Every structure is written in C-alpha cells, then in structure tokens.
Amino acid sequence: MEDKIVEIMKKNGINVTRIDRVTNSFSSNAYIVCSNNEKFIFKILYNEFKQKEEAKYLELLENILNVPKLLFSGNLDDKYFNVMTFVEGKSICDEMVNTLSFENIYNIGCLLGKLHNVDVSDKNENSWQKYLIESLSKTYQNLKFVSLNDKVYKYLIKCVELQKNEYDNVLLHLDFRLGNIIFGDETYLIDFESMKNGDSCFDFLKLYRILNKKEFKLFLKGYESIRKIPINLNERLEFYNIFDAYTSLNWCYERKTINSDFYNKNIKILERKFK
C-alpha cells in the first residue's frame, strides 16, 4: 500500500520521504505523508460516497472554519482516497479529557457553534427523521442476536415519532469528538465523511459524555457566544445517547468488530438504561 501511495503522491508533484500510519482513525485508513519540510494526510475512505462527501464539505468549509485544505482525490485499487494538508497540533483521546484547559473547552464550543451556523444544503425538515428511522431499522435487522434488541428499538422508534420537526435543522458533523479536533495555534476540525443536516443537539453528545458539569457549562458558553443553545438540550441528549449507543453496535457489526472495547462500551450504555 505504501509503495502505491508514494507513486500517487509523486504523480501529483510530491516526493515522499516518509509515511506513518495514523493510529486513532477508526472509520478510515489514514497516513501522514512527509515530503521534506511538508506533511500531508492520505486518507482512504470506507466507500466512494464517504470520499465524495468529505471532499464536498472540506471545500464548503475551507473559508468558514479551521479545516484541512483538500488537495486532490482519487481511486486506488477500488479504494477511494482524499489527500489534504496536515494540521499541526495535538489530538487527544477521551481518556485524556482532563488535560484540556478551560480555554480549550471554550474554543471547542465556539467551533461547534460556527459549524452549526453554516447554511444547510438540505432544507428538507423531514430528512433527519428519515435518517434516524432508517438507521434504527438497519440496526434492528442486524442485531437480532442482541438480547436487548427489541426493547431498545421500540423505545427509540417511539422517541423519534415524538420528536418530529421539533429540532433546530443545522449542518451536523455527526462525529464531533475529541479525536476529531486538533489543538494548536488555532482549534481545527477534521473528519467530514459522515456530515449531514439534522438536529443540532446530536453534535453535543460526545462531549456531554466525557465532560463534567462545570466543563460542559463552559463548552456551552463557548457555543452560546456564536449561536443560541438548542431548547430541551438535556432531554434530547438522553435520547441521542441511547440512539448512538445502539447504532454504534451496528457500526461494529458491519465491520466485524463486535468483540471490541468500543462495542462493549456501547452495550453497557444500553444495559444501564434497559436492565
């Protein structure tokens, strides 16, 4: 694979001196490609749709948020890739959340607020509910072997019906977590392959899970400096916490990783609610 990456980069005028695998990229294979004093990200996406979606949103957000610059895209052995600029800084995992400064946390809130201020391309208010129902239906069909499957599915479907059209329709990242934020001279956002429009509350979930109350209030303060906090946030986060845990099990199932720590972590979230 690395030899082919070298060949592709060379065709685009970049002489490679070193390639390192990115270790915290879960839904794609990413490499840091070094060329003398420059660095690039060579990212192989899960499928063509995700490649095109990420390329589209990188171009959309380039002059709005701090994001990498898309350089070129292509196909490698029936796998689809994007090449973008490397962002200098540090990315931390959830377990290192206590290393964040108050300024870091506030800036994360500002970053999310700026993203949610971007005009959505899909004005269809029903598309988010359709996405939720389709995600739940697919998960339900694939998780017949999970003892809580029926109970969780019925609960979530009922919640979706109750929340119809009662949300702030914004552009969502869908995986707004610490691992997709780079802390450097500025705060950068990465990983745009799953973006779509929908309920703004969903993007608060990953930070809600790991920040303590004081830190989450600071995060909200940063967000509120850009735009209003969505109504009924805590109530909706309870729903999305279960929805995300349930559909994450299906993510693991599709990638044959049901023995992973990530799978077990999400099973425990469901068990706390339904057992």
Model-identified regions with their sequence ranges:
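Generic structural signal for small/hydrophobic residues in well-ordered secondary structure
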Residues: 30, 42, 70, 85, ...
